[in-house]
Amino acid sequence: MKQYAIQPANLEFNAEGTPVSRDFDDVYFSNDNGLEETRYVFLGGNQLEERFPLHPRPLFVVAESGFGTGLNFLTLWQAFSQFRDAHPEATLQRLHFISFEKFPLTQADLALAHQHWPELAPWAQQLHAQWPLPLAGCHRLILDDGRVTLDLWFGDINELTGKLDESLNQKVDAWFLDGFAPAKNPDMWTQNLFSTMARLARPGGTLATFTSAGFVRRGLQEAGFTMQKRKGFGRKREMLCGVMAHALTFPSPTPWFTRSGSAKRDVAIIGGGIASALLSLALLRRGWQVTLYCSDEQPAQGASGNRQGALYPLLSKHDAAINLFFPSAFTFARRLYDALPVTFDHDWCGVTQLGWDEKSQHKIDQMLSLALPDALAVAVDPDQAQQETGVATHCRGITYPAGGWLCPAQLTAALLALAATQGLRRHYTHTLTALSRQATGWQLQFAEGKAVEHEVVVLANGHQINHVDQTRPLPVYSVAGQVSHIPTTPALSALRQVLCYDGYLTPQNPATHQHCIGASYHRGSEETAYREDDQQQNRQRLIDCFPDAAWAKEVDISEKAARCGVRCATRDHLPMVGNVPDYDATLAQYAALARQKDAAERAPVYPDLFMLGALGSRGLCSAPLCAEILAAQMSEEPIPMDADTLAALNPNRLWVRKLLKGKAVK
């Protein structure tokens, strides 16, 4: 997945107003009655109306081979809403839809196509509002107040199938095998696709497709489905239906990165910042009982306590994991923040990252070579940079139009207050000192002398994440930093975007008439006392980067107003999300991993102990998606990320990489 931007669909609308693919010379849906055909072929062919009331789990998972206009998804969503209205007490509470699309429609074409079905407008409008950018990989959309989740995988389905994480195995309750007709698009209808459908299908899972082509039926049978023909819709004579009648087994290609969830639903989250708050909401949405323990007297006293934090993605020319994770995380964060029913100071004013010297300009050129969509990242020359930011820097750079700033302290407090209305229990001044495994879960020991037990524990407590025995060996480190709060001036008030250089400067917050400028960097330090040297350096870095900018010299730090925080980071600039690995057992079990990969077993982890940390300086960007990934993993649901990137987020990755090369772990 080295190609990050995706080509949008090349289509036209025929005389009936139906979208037609120019590339495949085929309609996206029937000219006659596409809506009724979807209901008959996919909902009827999978017997969903009969299965929903009897479904034994709270989540029903549907996967689809071609999203197209989203007609199948919208029709299913409508039917699911009607089912929930009629059966509010049913076990089934949520719908999860996974779909693949090589050439996604533009937002404008999508809206035009949806004009065909005014009865679907209430659902279509929600889809339009969250329609993602044409970026490769998985885009998770949380819809209908969390009752419906849509995972849109952009890219060639036969390439993506090899990149899906094994946690998707046997998760799909029903398959919609859709797409342009086999004669029009033979590249999609492959044995590889049929085998992937079988791998992902739950025992008892079903499939339906509009075609009755013999090679499709035989291919699905070979993959493991029991197939039968059914009368086709309208003038079509036949269609195919199938069922996965037995459980297939598949060896893990990378058992050292296998993720495990939990069958339990009582969890203690340790922390009080943005990651803890977002994870609390994600787990509550899935029916967990959540209790939060925070060492401080109130939330957001650590790295999440700043007045203004910048929101923009981290990019790297040479690191595929960073370039897949952070754009996905950034776009997910914007969708989530925009949909939150809480208020917090923010401004999506854009972020401009400037090349102030030859080295930084080269770095920006490398980022621009990724050819991301302009709506995500676009080059600006010095004049354009001045036009975007409102101030003259005489530097070129890269602008993130959808970026901006927000107040993490306000957001965190608002999220935890929202979670409390949904059942979150909060305990402050609880400093975790030890964890011990019990027969039914974990005992948590606090510095204040209190001990409690919970079935599951998540460590999301920032730089304190490695302060218990189980996590002490983790290769993470603390970084102390000071952010200066400066009063605005007429010249500084002209700044319209967040400015990033060898530091950062935010536009003024209208509520405080102050800017934030930062931040100092002290690796290995957890010191939070005010430092005058840091205050001076924050100002001087701005002046050094833009020596000809008179406005930069107006920065006034004489009030000694600042905030000092500590963040947790890793050497590879990626978060750690997943099971807490057992260090000693990992080294013992994988001592000969470089020579015995084929015989490797699953990596040893502490059961029902998870972590979400090492968010570094991009926590506002990465925390929403990390929380969603971990909540999905813990709940044994589909995870919105490809296998390679999930491996790059695994807390054991730095050890395993060395062991795979036969190197010692120190």
UniProtKB/Swiss-Prot annotation:
Residues covered by region (FAD-dependent cmnm(5)s(2)U34 oxidoreductase): 270-666
Compartments in which it is found: Cytoplasm
InterPro entries tied to this protein: FAD-dep_OxRdtase (IPR006076), FAD/NAD-bd_sf (IPR036188), MnmC-like_methylTransf (IPR008471), SAM-dependent_MTases_sf (IPR029063), tRNA_MAMT_biosynth_bifunc_MnmC (IPR023032), tRNA_MNMC2 (IPR047785), tRNA_S-uridine_synth_MnmC_C (IPR017610)
Superkingdom, natural source: Bacteria
GO cellular component: cytoplasm
Cofactor: FAD
Keyword field: Cytoplasm, FAD, Flavoprotein, Methyltransferase, Multifunctional enzyme, Oxidoreductase, S-adenosyl-L-methionine, Transferase, tRNA processing
A GO molecular function held by the record: flavin adenine dinucleotide binding
Protein EC: 2.1.1.61, 1.5.-.-
Positions of the UniProt region annotated as tRNA (mnm(5)s(2)U34)-methyltransferase: 1-245
Catalytic activity: 5-aminomethyl-2-thiouridine(34) in tRNA + S-adenosyl-L-methionine = 5-methylaminomethyl-2-thiouridine(34) in tRNA + S-adenosyl-L-homocysteine + H(+)
Predominant subcellular localization, coarse grouping: cytoplasm
Gene Ontology biological-process annotations: methylation; tRNA wobble uridine modification
One Pfam family cited in the UniProt record for this chain: DAO
Family classification: In the N-terminal section; belongs to the methyltransferase superfamily. tRNA (mnm(5)s(2)U34)-methyltransferase family. In the C-terminal section; belongs to the DAO family.
Function: Catalyzes the last two steps in the biosynthesis of 5-methylaminomethyl-2-thiouridine (mnm(5)s(2)U) at the wobble position (U34) in tRNA. Catalyzes the FAD-dependent demodification of cmnm(5)s(2)U34 to nm(5)s(2)U34, followed by the transfer of a methyl group from S-adenosyl-L-methionine to nm(5)s(2)U34, to form mnm(5)s(2)U34.
Name of the featured protein: tRNA 5-methylaminomethyl-2-thiouridine biosynthesis bifunctional protein MnmC
Species of provenance: Citrobacter koseri (strain ATCC BAA-895 / CDC 4225-83 / SGSC4696)
Gene expressing this chain: mnmC
